């Protein structure tokens, strides 16, 4: 049986939090089979990342979500492409340079909040989650929830990909530091079940 030449090529060998995994799948022949991408994490756990049909010799894949520190640890990861009996490997490193990667589901909640479908108290739980996970920090604990109405505009921009996670995270951090946003001491964050599948 003929085995095509295959290669997986990353656009970068290192990524920061908030950036999206971006790579090309190159095949010498389209066989009609699917390509399967596996990822091995920093402690050696291997899982299936993606299965995709191949219809041309070169396919670009950009992850729908950026890396965040809740799911993705700093360190080295390996990608393995399997296609029609052929295998190609490459690796990349996640580097914590201080950039902020906010979990993708917070953006979904932001859209609900900015459209008036979620009350401030519920959105504050998402902010509390970011504090609990040390994505942002809450130096002063207040007793009363305060989120200024104008902050919805910034959140709307971020939820619609008009500003980056780092810019939004830094804006949020500034508002907390300046006590413009106050999260009460008894505010509970969302419980996130650890997932065995990587979301990317």
Where are the language model's segments positioned?
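Extracellular Ig-like/FN3 beta-sandwich strand-entry sites
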Residues: 20, 32, 72-76
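Aromatic/hydrophobic beta-strand junction motif of beta-rich domains
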Residues: 21-29
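Short, aromatic- and glycine-rich surface loops/edge beta-strands on solvent-exposed regions
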Residues: 37, 72-86
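Edge beta-strands of extracellular beta-sandwich domains
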Residues: 49-52, 76, 86-97
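Fold-core signature of tandem repeat domains
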Residues: 105-113, 118, 123-131, 136, ...
């Amino acid at each position: 049986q003929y085995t095509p030449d295959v290669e997986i090529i990353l656009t970068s060998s290192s990524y920061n939090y908030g950036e999206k995994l971006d790579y090309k799948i190159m095949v010498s022949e389209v066989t009609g089979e699917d390509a399967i991408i596996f990822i091995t994490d920093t402690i050696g756990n291997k899982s299936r990342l993606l299965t995709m049909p191949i219809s041309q010799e070169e396919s670009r894949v950009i992850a729908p979500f950026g890396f965040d520190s809740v799911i993705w640890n700093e360190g080295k990861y390996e990608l393995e492409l399997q296609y029609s009996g052929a295998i190609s490997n490459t690796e990349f490193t996640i580097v914590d340079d201080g950039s902020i990667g906010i979990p993708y589901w917070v953006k979904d909640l932001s859209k609900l909040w900015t459209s008036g479908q979620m009350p401030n108290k519920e959105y504050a739980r998402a902010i509390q989650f970011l504090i609990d996970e040390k994505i942002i920090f809450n130096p002063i604990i207040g007793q009363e929830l305060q989120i200024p109405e104008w902050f919805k505009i910034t959140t709307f921009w971020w939820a619609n990909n008009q500003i980056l996670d780092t810019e939004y995270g830094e804006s949020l951090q500034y508002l907390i530091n300046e006590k413009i946003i106050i999260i009460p001491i008894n505010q509970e964050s969302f419980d996130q079940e650890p997932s065995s599948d990587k979301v990317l």
